[in-house]
Structure formats: C-alpha cells, structure tokens
C-alpha cells in the first residue's frame, strides 16, 4: 500500500452541486520559454524505480514536471537543488547537468514531464558519467 501523502490526489474536489473544480498545481511567471516562432513540445510520463537514478543529463529548454507518486531529488554540481513529492510541480534549470533520484526504498517515483525546446536543439543531452 502506498502512503496517501506519496500519491497525487486526482479526484474528490467537487462539492455537491458543483460541476467543475480546477486544482491549480502551478501558476508562475516563467522567463525561459524559447522565443522561436515555433518550439518542439514533448510530453511524457516517467518512472524511477525505488532507490533508482536517472542518467546524468541536462535539459536544453524549459522543462516542467508534475509529480504523481513518490519522492524525487535532483543532484546538481551545487547539491540537491530540486526536491519534490506527489502533487508538486517543479522545473529543472536549463543546461545544468544533473541526475534524478528516487530515495524511497519501496515506492516508485512517477511523473509527467512537459518540455519546450527550440527547434534546432534536442530536448535532452545525456552524459555517460558525472560531467564535473
């Protein structure tokens, strides 16, 4: 059984007689959207196994993540700059190498990623080893 605080609540917001409720998860000004007339858009879901890591990589455009389940940490050269749990929305810095980690021993980390990248760039640049 996954603890309730590690799962994003998706329903149960509307009250009797109410037909719609928008649960706003992220509403901020963001200055790093590509300025090109067109941008590449990628939307995906990802899973990091309990105790698992992503590869070392950097994002080449604006990237937003919606944590659906579990816990997430992102290790950068400066340390852990991103920490999230189910229900959080976060962005990772553009062009800063890092790797993601699921520190929970039993619960997979699940998220939805949204990427906006200039058309002449790949969404992600991967590194085989820690780049610093």
Please annotate each region the language model reported.
Residues 94-122:
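Ligand-binding loop in jelly-roll beta-barrel domains
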Residues 35-37, 58, 66, 103-108:
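Extracellular/periplasmic catalytic domains that process cell-envelope and extracellular macromolecules
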Residues 1-40, 127-132:
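A short, N-terminal "cap"/entry segment at the start of jelly-roll beta-barrel domains
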Residues 39, 51-64:
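A short beta-loop-beta micro-motif enriched in histidine and acidic residues
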Residues 59-78:
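Glycine- and acidic-residue-biased ligand/ion/polar-headgroup-sensing regions
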